[in-house]
Amino acid sequence: MEGKEGPPCEVRLPTPGAEREGPVHPELGAFGESASDAIKLSETSNDAKKEEIEEELDPRIQEELERLNQASEEINLLELQLDEARTAYRRILTESARRLNGLATQLGACIDKARPYYEARRLAKEAQQDTHSAALRYERAVSMHAAAREMVFVAEQGVTADKNRLDPTWQEMLNHATCKVNEAEEERLRSEFEHQRVTRLCHEAEAKVQTLQKSLKRLIIKSRPYFELKAQLNTILEEHKSRVTLLENSVAQAKLRYSGTLHNLEKISEEIHARRTQSSVLSQRAPPLGAEAPPSVKDGETGPPADTVSLLSLQTIASDLQKSDSVEHLRDLTDVTSLDGRETGAVESGGSRERGEDRGTGGAFRHHRSVSL
């Protein structure tokens, strides 16, 4: 049994917003697609231009990256040298201990018996160095004291030059020179006392060395190879230790430079991100396409190109056609007005007859719209 057909005038209309079943006018569809493609291409080109401008206007990134690479290479090189220096120091230390232990086994107990003499010699040598340093400080304090006294003499001459008037400049200079004399006098007395003290200690250390040398003469001669070798090895170890310390300081400085370069790159990245965020906010606040009226053209000036105006008009038409898919929207219209403002009553009457024929036959609904550019 065949299905019951509906009334002849009943037409099943598409829901608003659904896809249109009928084909869109080929020229309008092409114009809409070309307009959309043009807008996408313009946005892509604008983004690319913005990125190129940012790269061109901010060359600091390349400079900081070069510094970062240099610092990284320097750190790697210095760490390799530091590892080699530490390995050499440990090797020399182990070899020194082995040689000294072997020599101590050969010489026997004379090393321990002669050790006070060599310890006294070491203390006497340190006392001599302290005495020399104290003497230099005392001489410098004496020179400063003499210069301060000379300044006081000059200031007194300036103050007493004019007996009828007291010059405040010379008075201030005299006060300043007097303070310098007092400070220099205190430093001279302090350095003199220190020099006397270390000189006395040096004399005592030298006297002790002489006493031990007389009492331990045979043991000193017998154990001399051991202590001479020990002094040589200590000198070599001190040199390697100084090199290790120097390399450690160099590595620390290189790492500080590397960290500073990373910090600079982070700051540059934050600045670029802030600029991009601000640019995106400004672009979102920009008026939409066609919202602003075109500026009036003055005499002697040319307006915008005809291609640009046509493109904007066609884009608006295509958007309207895509939105007006519902026939109910067309039924509510009492008049159909062309794009140039002229009334199209004949088109409306023709369209009514076509709709009546379509309803009588139950065929598909067709929609014709007059477009005048």
Curated annotation (Swiss-Prot):
GO molecular function, one term: protein kinase inhibitor activity
Chain positions covered by the region annotation Disordered: 1-36, 274-308, 332-373
Keyword Coiled coil belongs to the record: yes
Family: Belongs to the SH3BP5 family.
Gene Ontology biological process: intracellular signal transduction
Record's keyword terms, sorted: Coiled coil, Guanine-nucleotide releasing factor
Coiled coil: 35-98, 170-258
PANTHER family: SH3 DOMAIN-BINDING PROTEIN 5, SH3 DOMAIN-BINDING PROTEIN 5-LIKE
A GO cellular component annotation in the UniProt record: cytoplasm
Regions of compositional bias (Basic and acidic residues) in chain numbering: 332-360
Gene, per the UniProt record: sh3bp5l
InterPro entries assigned to the protein according to its UniProt record, in alphabetical order: SH3BP5 (IPR007940)
Protein species of origin: Xenopus laevis
Function: Functions as a guanine nucleotide exchange factor (GEF) for rab11a.
Record bears the keyword Coiled coil: yes
Protein name, as recorded: SH3 domain-binding protein 5-like
